[in-house]
């Protein structure tokens, strides 16, 4: 279980995150919502090692994540996507996922790229896993395409596949359906539900699409000005017009 206690983060004396505490429910989908600047992405950056925190503790399965680099946290079983997609745009779709697999063997990027040029048993194994992930997200026919040539929605799917390549138990998704068409939202909804219901993944996401949030979430956390305002069932959030108006308008 991912457990955060009394987390603080300040930038030049300004508190961006204050007294943030959460025990993430395993095998569930938890959404973190709130206005721009509330501190949501900062929390994700703190949990995944992209920023150091000022005070507090973050533990996963009883082990402290303090001071760990993002790749070490990923090897603990926690991976993430970003609001601004971080793909290797000049590499193919398949190569992007293969690079995600390199965490499993401890290879660096250059070594992983070297694997692409041979047909070793290790390469074949990583190839099969990567192809199955692309099939899972519906990009099996785009393997040879450059990542930059995919539609924005397809790039979102690829980012999920890359996230899954490291075989995580917990996925942190930053605005997974932002800016995509309704049919792609439906596809991503189905993918995330299957990850939880059939693969026992735990998902924590940030999203501004309230309809998507209320439809998919088991728990919704509302955050503003660096603090948690409320933490509740989506039906309770949906019935609270004050919260919806104040934080999602």
Language-model features: where?
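Catalytic Walker B motif of ABC-type/P-loop ATPase nucleotide-binding domains
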Residues: 171-175
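Helix-to-loop junction immediately C-terminal to a conserved catalytic motif
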Residues: 48
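Conserved ABC ATPase "signature" region
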Residues: 110-142, 190-193
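The feature captures the beta-strand-to-loop junction immediately N-terminal to the Walker
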Residues: 33-35
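Conserved ABC transporter NBD signature motif
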Residues: 56-64, 76
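Conserved catalytic motifs of ABC-family nucleotide-binding domains
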Residues: 167
């Amino acid at each position: 279980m991912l457990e955060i206690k009394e987390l603080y983060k300040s930038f030049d004396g300004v508190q961006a995150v204050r007294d943030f505490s959460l025990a993430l429910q395993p095998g569930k989908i938890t959404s973190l919502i709130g206005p721009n600047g509330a501190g949501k992405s900062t929390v994700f950056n703190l949990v995944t090692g992209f920023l150091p925190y000022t005070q507090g503790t973050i533990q996963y399965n009883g082990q402290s994540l303090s001071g760990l680099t993002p790749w070490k946290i990923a090897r603990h079983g926690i991976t993430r996507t970003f609001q601004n997609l971080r793909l290797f745009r000049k590499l193919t779709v398949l190569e992007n996922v293969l690079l995600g697999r390199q965490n499993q063997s401890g290879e660096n990027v250059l070594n992983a790229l070297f694997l692409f040029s041979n047909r070793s048993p290790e390469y074949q194994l990583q190839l099969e896993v990567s192809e199955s992930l692309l099939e899972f997200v519906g990009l099996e026919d785009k393997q040879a395409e450059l990542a930059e040539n995919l539609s924005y929605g397809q790039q979102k799917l690829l980012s999920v596949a890359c996230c899954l390549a490291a075989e995580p138990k917990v996925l942190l998704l930053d605005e997974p359906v932002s800016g995509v068409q309704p049919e792609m939202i439906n596809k991503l909804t189905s993918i995330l539900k299957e990850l939880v219901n059939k693969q026992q993944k735990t998902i924590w996401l940030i999203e501004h699409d309230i309809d998507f949030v209320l439809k998919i979430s088991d728990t919704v956390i509302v955050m503003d000005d660096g603090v948690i305002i409320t933490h509740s069932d989506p039906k309770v959030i949906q019935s609270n017009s004050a919260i919806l108006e104040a934080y999602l308008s």
